[in-house]
Structures are given as structure tokens and as C-alpha cells.
């Protein structure tokens, strides 16, 4: 909120925040559903969703009520004590998935850090202290801590911070032969996003994930699914593993889990969880009542046939608009993804210009994302209305027209 002494503008960002982001020139101040307004009152249609976070749009009444109600009851206890919202949310996740145990954290990075530590510790105590190899994939993204950014397969994020955690191997995504070539009995885990979000909205093939499951079983390694971006209804199933019919040993969830309130979770089986003991891992804020109350309300809405089945129809509407834009301007070489995580790859003549289309979209009143320099990404609310899709994509078409003119 602006103070009486100093007005808050985009320039304020450059004066007070570390230069690790390059935010848009406008500052959003209000949101409702799939609409956002900036300081000047300009309206935007939001197809970015806070990077696949605001799964029920902005200020959904059920989430607002959950936050208000819990905010008047209990905010924080730490994990010296437990709390009802965390236990209720944990039960909901376990009842709806393969998991038997859950640990709450605050971000996707923390959930993945937990998963990777557990995978290595489980291998150490159940098998051998030398079973430490983690196999991950090129162009993957698993977070920003030193461990998670090292497991992620993008040197632009991991280089320049000194020695990295050892025994992490990266191979091409969707290449089962490459995995077989490096996998052995020293492998503790294979870590994969069923859909690489930051890596260009690339979906794994069913054969690839099933092959990973078989290899993990053969070598007594754990299969870890990072569903931070593609989980919680984004694909049209509650979690992407359900679409593929491949069950992981560990699954991580964040982003849409809280509908905009920071919360994450690592899900696993009782057997694997038992490798941890009191003090093995933890978080001061993880599983706090405010976050879990909001996440519980979001879960109750997302995990319904009405919402999950509607995602497929909404996806088709987006794809039809993108196909029409491509017919008019000839800019996309591929339209891909799953559910409401959609990628549109730019043709070679527009290579490297995804940010140009993003900025033009904002100017036209629509918020979109890029996934690398060559892919436009759409991750709207799972309950975005048809009218918002139509109007927002019309605005995006206008933006495309200006860029290619």
C-alpha cells in the first residue's frame, strides 16, 4: 500500500527489491475471478494465473471465507504443536491419492527439497550409503535452493554458485534409452515432471513414464514426480500421474494447492516416510493453519467432477483460439500441453521473441506467460469462464498482430 509520503510505482521496485525479477511495467492491485486491475484502473484478463497458482481465480469467495474464518481463530503454532486444518488437509490428500503420509511445506522448492532428501535418506538407511545417484532431466525445473536447482536441468539457473551437490545426472527428457544407459543399483531416485512447465510445456509420453517406473522397480530406486506446476487439477485429473496410470513413490505439490496462498506438500507411502524420524526434516511455517485452511477449501472445489471435467472443454476453447491465431498470422509450430497447461511454440522466424508477445499481451489487456524464449504458456484459472476465454484470446490475437506487423 502506498504511504502518504511516497507513492508506490514500478520504479519503486528497482529501488528496493533485489534485481532477480523483471516485472511488467504495471502493478496489479485488485483481482476478481479471471480479471485483474492495475493502479490506473486498467483491466486485464489473467491467463497466467500467477504461474499456475490461482487455480480458482482471484479472491474466490470460498477461499476468502476460509482465510477470514481461520484468521479470526488461529494463525500459527509451529510444528511443536499440530493443528486441525493441517490434519484435515492431510487426510483429504491421502484419501484422494496413492499416498499414506504427507509433509507440508511453503513452496515448491521446499517440497522438492524434502523429496530429494527423503529419497537419499531412504536409500541410505534401507539399502546402502553409496546409493546416492539422482537421475533428472535436461530443461527440468525443480526450484531455486542449491539442491533443487542442481537437480533441475538448466545450467543458466544453477551455474555460478560454487560447488553443486554431487551425484546428479541429467539426461534428455522422454529418452528412456538415455536413462537406461546411466541407471544402476547406485541410483536412489529418478526425478521427473510429468509435464515440464518451465522447460517449454513438454509432456512426458506414457511409455516414458511407465519405463521409468519399471527401471526404478528393477534397481530399487524411488520414482519422484514433481507435480508442482502440473498437479492439482491442471491436467483435468487431480494429479497428472492419474492420467498416465503410473504411480510414483513420492509426489510434490504446491502452486495451485493453496489457490494463491503459499503452501506445498510432499506425498509418499508409509514405508518410505518411515525412513525419516523426529528431526530429520522440518519447517517452522510448514502446515500452518492459515495456509492449510485455504488449501482445504481449494481442494474441496478442485477435486470435483464439475471442475475436473470442465477443464477439457476449456482447453479445447483455448486450442481453437490458438489455431485461429496461427491460421491468421502463421506464428506457431506446435500447440501442446495437457488440460489448462498449454504451450504454443513459436516458429523459427519468431525464435527468441516470446517475451515480446507477453509484453504486447499486457498492453492489450491480457496476462500470459512464456516458457523459455520460444514458447508462449497459458495457465489460467481452472474455472475460467467461456466469455473470459473468448475475450482474452481476442486481446491476445490483437497483441500478436501488433508484434508481427
UniProtKB/Swiss-Prot annotation:
User: Which InterPro entries would you find in this protein's record?
Assistant: Ac/SucOrn_transaminase_bac, AcOrn/SuccOrn_fam, Aminotrans_3, Aminotrans_3_PPA_site, Class-III_PLP-dep_AT, PyrdxlP-dep_Trfase, PyrdxlP-dep_Trfase_major, PyrdxlP-dep_Trfase_small
Q: Does the keyword Cytoplasm apply?
A: yes
Cofactor annotation? pyridoxal 5'-phosphate
Cofactor note from UniProt?
Answer: Binds 1 pyridoxal phosphate per subunit.
GO biological process terms held by the UniProt record: L-arginine biosynthetic process; lysine biosynthetic process via diaminopimelate
Binding of N(2)-acetyl-L-ornithine: at which residues? 144, 283
State the reactions this protein catalyses. Answer: N(2)-acetyl-L-ornithine + 2-oxoglutarate = N-acetyl-L-glutamate 5-semialdehyde + L-glutamate; N-succinyl-(2S,6S)-2,6-diaminopimelate + 2-oxoglutarate = (S)-2-succinylamino-6-oxoheptanedioate + L-glutamate
Where pyridoxal 5'-phosphate is bound, by residue? 108-109, 141, 226-229, 284
Keyword annotations for this protein?
A: Amino-acid biosynthesis, Aminotransferase, Arginine biosynthesis, Cytoplasm, Lysine biosynthesis, Pyridoxal phosphate, Transferase
Gene3D superfamilies, per this entry?
Aspartate Aminotransferase, domain 1, Type I PLP-dependent aspartate aminotransferase-like (Major domain)
Q: Which residues carry this modification: N6-(pyridoxal phosphate)lysine?
A: 255
Where is it localised? Cytoplasm
The pathway it acts in is: Amino-acid biosynthesis; L-arginine biosynthesis; N(2)-acetyl-L-ornithine from L-glutamate: step 4/4; Amino-acid biosynthesis; L-lysine biosynthesis via DAP pathway; LL-2,6-diaminopimelate from (S)-tetrahydrodipicolinate (succinylase route): step 2/3
Query: Which top-level group of life is the source organism from?
Result: Bacteria
HAMAP family in the cross-refs: ArgD_aminotrans_3
Q: Which NCBIfam families match?
A: arg_catab_astC (TIGR03246), argD (TIGR00707), PRK01278.1 (NF002325), PRK05093.1 (NF003468), PRK12381.1 (NF009047)
The family this protein is said to belong to: Belongs to the class-III pyridoxal-phosphate-dependent aminotransferase family. ArgD subfamily.
User: Sorted alphabetically, which PANTHER family does this protein's record hold?
Assistant: ACETYLORNITHINE_SUCCINYLDIAMINOPIMELATE AMINOTRANSFERASE (PTHR11986:SF122), AMINOTRANSFERASE CLASS III (PTHR11986)
Q: How does this protein assemble? A: Homodimer.
User: Would you tell me the protein name for this molecule?
Assistant: Acetylornithine/succinyldiaminopimelate aminotransferase
- The source organism is Salmonella typhi
Gene responsible for this protein: argD
